[in-house]
Amino acid sequence: MRNLGVWIEIGGLQTYVGRIIGEKEEDARFSYAEEYLSGNIARPISIHLPLSANAFSVDDTRNFFEGLLPEGFTRRCVAGLLHTDANNYLSLLAGLGNECLGAIKITDENNEVVNADYQKLTIDEVSQLAREGAMETAELVTKSHLSLTGASGKVGLYYDENNKDWYLPKGSAPSTHIVKQSHVRLDGIVTNEQLCMMTAGNMGIEIPESFIVNVGDGRDEEVLLATKRYDRAIKDGLKKINGLSVPYRLHQEDFSQAMGISAHNKYESDNAGYLKMMFEIIRQKSFNPIADQLKMWDICIFNYLIGNTDNHIKNVSLLYDEELKTVRLAPAYDILSTVIYTSSTRDMAFSIGNEYDIKKITRDSFRREAANIGLGEQMAMKRFDYLANAFPDALNKACDELLGKGFNKAIDIYERIRDRRREFIS
């Protein structure tokens, strides 16, 4: 029998929410605790898991909580280290749930309690992280009991900005940055993502702070991408561990979780209408629905312009305030040009104007999609034209900034993006 406690941080305090109970993952169901429901701070932990005294279905339970876990090779590696099956999401949650994306924490009474702490990393250890593969990263993730979604090799670390030192969180200690490795099959991916994120920022799209950590001469095996977590915040007067201010957690959920869709179905098929569903959630739930619809539309356009076909529904999220009272569209993240790699698909993760193939998507496709999702045509196409016209200069500026910092790989990525755009975008 699995009996996992579910907690969420509200206003900086860990609050018991409920439990996931089941003999195995095939019958595990989440339910809110009676004391949580009767309290004056009760808030849903997901749009798809509204406050209810009834236990949620097996599928609804799995779709939300499995969405907190790593995917792909990293997940298989972590499962091996935890001596469990990669499909056993309950065991993975029990092993990694101390520090998840957002403000959720998972506890297992059978696990030894690990005190919250920060372990300072030496320069050599940071360098080793850059040079090691996904298996070694999975070991670090397992040791820190930290769960980050996605399939790439990444780990949550604490960055002391004043002293430029990195720390590995232990137990329930929150991280401040998500740190990604290069990818053995996708050359220049760290520079690629940083270039794309900077380009988006130059065009007025909200992005989290990020920077390249160079532990050598800037080669792929010597760089890491550090992204400041928008779901963590540091305020004056916070608790300290070893002299370090402990950030408080802000809750978030990706659109796969908010829509109640399994992570296995994060890529749309058969014109299922994912984008329309996302816009409907924004209209109904955002505290500023007009602004967030425009932000979402800008992100869709930018993914097309930059050639990001990995724009699935787990790569867009909703961010809650610290009291879980309001929700808004989170900053854009995980944006890179996938089309510069020959192994990538040309199909976007969801259709635009009933088209998936990026080579077949046109300005008119966006006009049709605007009508489909309920955006005014004049406003929607004005944004499209503005971003399309601003894109070349924004990309060039981002490239120059990276070159100025000594990241010479940027010019190669820039030229490949430019050349692929000429092929795909008429």
Per-range role (PLM):
Residues 1-313, 317-426:
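Phosphate/dinucleotide-binding and metal-coordinating scaffold of catalytic cores
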